Swiss-Prot record:
Name of the coding gene: prnC
SUPFAM superfamilies: FAD/NAD(P)-binding domain
InterPro entries found in the cross-reference section: FAD/NAD-bd_sf, Flavin-dep_Halogenase_NPB, Flavin_halogenase
Annotated protein name in UniProt: Monodechloroaminopyrrolnitrin halogenase PrnC
GO BP terms, alphabetized: antibiotic biosynthetic process
Consequence of gene loss (knockout): Cells lacking this gene lose the ability to produce pyrrolnitrin and accumulate MDA.
UniProt pathway annotation: Antibiotic biosynthesis
Keyword line: Antibiotic biosynthesis, Monooxygenase, Oxidoreductase
Record-level Gene Ontology MF annotations: monooxygenase activity
Amino acid sequence: MTQKSPANEHDSNHFDVIILGSGMSGTQMGAILAKQQFRVLIIEESSHPRFTIGESSIPETSLMNRIIADRYGIPELDHITSFYSTQRYVASSTGIKRNFGFVFHKPGQEHDPKEFTQCVIPELPWGPESHYYRQDVDAYLLQAAIKYGCKVHQKTTVTEYHADKDGVAVTTAQGERFTGRYMIDCGGPRAPLATKFKLREEPCRFKTHSRSLYTHMLGVKPFDDIFKVKGQRWRWHEGTLHHMFEGGWLWVIPFNNHPRSTNNLVSVGLQLDPRVYPKTDISAQQEFDEFLARFPSIGAQFRDAVPVRDWVKTDRLQFSSNACVGDRYCLMLHANGFIDPLFSRGLENTAVTIHALAARLIKALRDDDFSPERFEYIERLQQKLLDHNDDFVSCCYTAFSDFRLWDAFHRLWAVGTILGQFRLVQAHARFRASRNEGDLDHLDNDPPYLGYLCADMEEYYQLFNDAKAEVEAVSAGRKPADEAAARIHALIDERDFAKPMFGFGYCITGDKPQLNNSKYSLLPAMRLMYWTQTRAPAEVKKYFDYNPMFALLKAYITTRIGLALKK
């Protein structure tokens, strides 16, 4: 039950939690807390529907949201965890994501057909991921927060913020004052609490340097019309496409890539290292056109494309904070810091933070005890998530200079994400069997390699850091890219938990496209599960103290039946 001080019990302007911002993190936190019968106020300076990015889901994001939905009884969060449920329950504007596609380019040259990698998202057990049309998804989650009891003030400007060990308060431009027991800042780069408490680090500590220009477009051709791999099961157009080149990358996120879509738009975003491509005063459209002129295969995809809204053109994307937790307040992940959209890790790391913070904040509210040590883990978690993502992305920007280095280093991402998924699925399987929240709290029980894709496996931690050292040697000019790439491949081959991951058809390359040999992913999934039960090393088997094949098929059948009954 909610505990309130007697003086504030009947004050309509007093809340247990005040949330600044109504994006996905704010509304998810609001829904969780309101479902637990706490009084929650969400304050939003703008209003819904609205344009924002962060449009591509990944399996770890969906697994984490599935856990949160099950733990706190919020089906709306479960609805955004697969393409099928998002398209059915949330918005027909949703695009489908069956793969991560990475295509390498060199200035002035047509794309070399062998220089690509593609990672397939399996059909089993929950189906493909989603391209979120955020204005619809965010509005859906806001409605869910309101449904569970959140009070929402949109188009509300806050002029004063207060937070100390005794409580929190905000004052609006209209002169209203709201008080609370805790405050969560989901305000992104312009987070007001970061400004008030002077939390931003100058200079930013992150190694990654990138700026961005992005918009939504009509008339973007499927890249399959320009480049098609013989025998390739999943089209580039059915996934999130990354065009890579020295000094940056371009995302292409189609919402119009399946027959049921009611959305003709494609999200397009160009990331550039400002040390290679300094920002100038020319318009974003002119800069984009000049970029397309340098890369003919990309230019062909955009020959007939037109933006439907003004371009957003940024300065350096990266920012960092020296702290994200203080007296009765917390900055959510993207209010604390940001790296880069590469690998779509922002939403996943936000979901990880939500899960960890919600459990701790609910206990603090019930105990009426907000002592800093209760939230110390959140501080370390967020900073480690950002730092490790920075390590990954900064190495990738180095690897964009040579396809051989990219092909080698990106395998650390592929292996890490699969292992991380094993860890999440195991925790959820235990919880589904026991309904004991301790089985989920174990995820945040201070794992030894906090922030890493697989936070409790020493072998992966060592592999990643060995590979990172090779890429950083290239960046520093101490080693040629081909030599570092060969060494990274050797490091992977030496690990019996890593090398077999590339034999199940989920990760294909230009020289081995035949590995993607099962359109519906049943055979690769069963082969993978069989390996985990038989020949996998102990560090992998530890994630399978349940029957994974039974759980896999049960989840698949349950999901399909549930969707069929809603037709």
